């Protein structure tokens, strides 16, 4: 038992060396994962009296890209990336309302500050926040089995505020972040609505130290 107790500090130090980068170092991390997103669209009325409504539902999509990081100090790092994400929302079929799906294809640049909570006790665990600049590549809607491009109904630029947590073990990086939409994406002239895209990303990456 005493031997195990004596080995624990050395084990913790070993894991810390594997997970924590030195100040002044660079790394690049390709990552891939899934996201759950929704647009803040108005409710759909299910009857003419407007007594029953249906909210937009989350939809699942793919997230993939690459991020580079600079370790400023032991607890602070800055990162920038180029990420693709397929986001949107959907309304399920209910009553006289047909199923409708909205798909948005974004190319985004996340600019983040990463705060490593306690490098000695919790090596590799960090909180992150910053700003994300997105560009809408294409938008498609599916109604009654027919898919049409409706990119003109959306503004191209999407600004969001990401906040998340990540864990690095050796070269494996697990990341969970929530992107809060800031800009109104609705450009439809006949609609006085505010469409913001909120999404939760879960990705797994492999870190290459430069």
Q: For each predicted feature, which ranges?
A:
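Cleavable N-terminal export/targeting peptides
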Residues: 1-25, 209-210
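Short glycine/proline- and aromatic-enriched beta-strand/turn motifs that initiate or cap beta-hairpins
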Residues: 20-61
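Gram-negative (and chloroplast) outer-membrane scaffold detector with strong preference
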Residues: 22-28, 34-40, 67-140, 203-210
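Residues that define the transmembrane beta-barrel architecture of outer-membrane proteins
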Residues: 24-28, 58-62, 103-109, 123, ...
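Outer-membrane beta-barrel translocator domains and adjoining extracellular loop/strand segments
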Residues: 40-48, 90-97, 139-146, 186-191
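Outer-membrane beta-barrel proteins
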Residues: 52-56, 68, 99-101, 149-153, ...
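Predominantly the C-terminal beta-signal and adjacent terminal strand-loop region
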Residues: 81-83, 87, 151-210
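A charged, solvent-exposed segment within the mature domains of Sec-exported extracytoplasmic proteins
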Residues: 124-166
């Amino acid at each position: 038992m005493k031997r195990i107790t004596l080995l624990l500090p050395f084990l913790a130090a070993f894991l810390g060396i594997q997970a924590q980068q030195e100040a002044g170092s660079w790394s690049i991390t390709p990552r891939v994962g899934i996201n759950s997103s929704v647009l803040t669209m108005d409710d759909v009325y299910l009857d003419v009296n407007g007594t029953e409504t249906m909210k937009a539902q989350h939809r699942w999509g793919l997230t993939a890209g690459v991020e580079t990081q600079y370790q400023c100090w032991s607890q602070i790092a800055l990162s920038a990336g180029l990420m693709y994400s397929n986001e949107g929302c959907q309304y399920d079929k209910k009553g006289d309302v047909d199923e409708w799906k909205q798909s948005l294809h974004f190319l985004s640049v996340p600019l983040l500050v990463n705060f490593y909570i306690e490098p000695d006790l919790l090596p590799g665990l960090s909180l992150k926040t910053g700003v994300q600049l997105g560009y809408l590549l294409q938008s498609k809607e599916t109604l009654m089995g027919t898919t049409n491009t409706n990119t003109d109904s959306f503004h191209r630029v999407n600004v969001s505020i990401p906040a998340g947590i990540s864990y690095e073990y050796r070269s494996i990086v697990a990341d969970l972040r929530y992107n809060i939409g800031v800009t109104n994406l609705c450009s439809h002239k006949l609609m006085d609505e505010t469409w913001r895209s909120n999404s939760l990303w879960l990705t797994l990456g492999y870190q290459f130290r430069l």
